[in-house]
């Protein structure tokens, strides 16, 4: 995501709602299968829509400096800000005062699919907030320092997103083996060991063949891809054999 666009503020404004929408889809999966995370899914839907409206405001109001910004009209920006305030505040007020959803008691352990998807949601939300903060910080700094300007460049975003991307990829490979409610530890650990050995051998082969061409980021990308692919294939073959 940060390759060709160099973490442009306008592109970040589109990236943040995408991250929140991905978290929402995973949260709805838990809500559909286990009837939990209901309130959290509702909040995520409000926040994802709010981030979309906020991105529209940032792009069209002219307060962001970007070659990708367009329709720089302050009056139009105020109109979009009014729409943003009306729908987002209205949605939050309705959620707070009209929410009659009762908490549903449901057991799930730390090695369950529910907990894995909860971690997924937390990581995606923290990542979205971190990117939004880096995008808006120059505006906040300028507002509180009498017009002094500062820029937040690619080093900040790469420092933030790289560990999150690696962690999300690793957790995605592990989450493939998790079951609803609880997972049998011995079966889970056994499959994970087989996958880890396979990926380790594949990593050695890639290092031997492409050592001069692979930079660290590309290597980790290939590693995570192979990790998820191996888990998917093992799960697919286990279903077919069953």
Where are each of the predicted segments found?
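Hydrophobic, small-residue-rich alpha-helical packing segments that form membrane-like cores
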Residues: 1-59, 65-68, 72-84
């Amino acid at each position: 995501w940060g390759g060709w666009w160099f973490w442009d503020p306008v592109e970040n404004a589109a990236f943040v709602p995408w991250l929140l929408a991905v978290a929402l889809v995973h949260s709805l999966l838990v809500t559909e299968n286990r009837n939990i995370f209901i309130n959290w899914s509702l909040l995520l839907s409000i926040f994802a829509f709010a981030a979309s409206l906020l991105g529209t405001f940032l792009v069209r109001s002219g307060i962001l400096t970007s070659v990708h910004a367009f329709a720089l009209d302050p009056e139009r920006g105020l109109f979009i800000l009014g729409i943003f305030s009306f729908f987002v505040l209205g949605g939050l007020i309705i959620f707070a005062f009209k929410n009659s959803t009762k908490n549903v008691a449901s057991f799930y352990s730390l090695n369950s699919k529910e907990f894995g998807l909860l971690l997924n949601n937390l990581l995606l939300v923290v990542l979205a907030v971190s990117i939004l903060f880096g995008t808006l910080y120059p505006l906040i700094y300028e507002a509180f320092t009498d017009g002094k300007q500062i820029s937040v460049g690619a080093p900040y975003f790469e420092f933030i997103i790289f560990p999150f991307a690696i962690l999300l990829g690793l957790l995605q490979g592990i989450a493939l083996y998790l079951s609803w409610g609880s997972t049998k530890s011995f079966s889970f650990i056994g499959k994970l060991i087989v996958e880890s050995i396979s990926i380790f051998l594949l990593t050695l082969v890639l290092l031997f063949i492409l050592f001069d061409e692979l930079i660290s980021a590309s290597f980790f990308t290939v590693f995570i891809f192979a990790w998820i692919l191996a888990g998917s294939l093992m799960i697919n073959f286990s279903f077919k054999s069953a």
